[in-house]
């Protein structure tokens, strides 16, 4: 069966994302991988657009804020989760204030990751459905004129 959801993983450090990759491989999710903000931008400008972006806080050509800006311009609604190597309260607050769906550190548990992913994917799907409903043409009835 074709996966219902897709995730874009944006990182350049394979050593840090090994466990997350293993978790994603066990779920019915299509996973794409890019190594930079520029590559993420190209992927978010095409259809079908991923439902969720999991991005490293630091990238070779930018950071999480660049990915959030790119995601805001994506062709479809997409959520972003920022992943940091350390628990940093200031970074967490900045990430959430700038509109990310969530923030995770490398020290996550499998149940926590699965729960966060499910919430983020469901939220993106609801936003896409609402957007599609708002874009649907409203049928116009012909006026009945009595002569």
Give the location of each predicted region.
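Acidic, metal-coordinating helix/loop segments flanking the phosphotransfer/catalytic sites
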Residues: 35-52, 60
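C-terminal output helix
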Residues: 90, 108-117, 125
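CheY-like receiver
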Residues: 122-147
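Short amphipathic alpha-helix used as the core "switch/output" element in two-component signaling
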Residues: 65-77
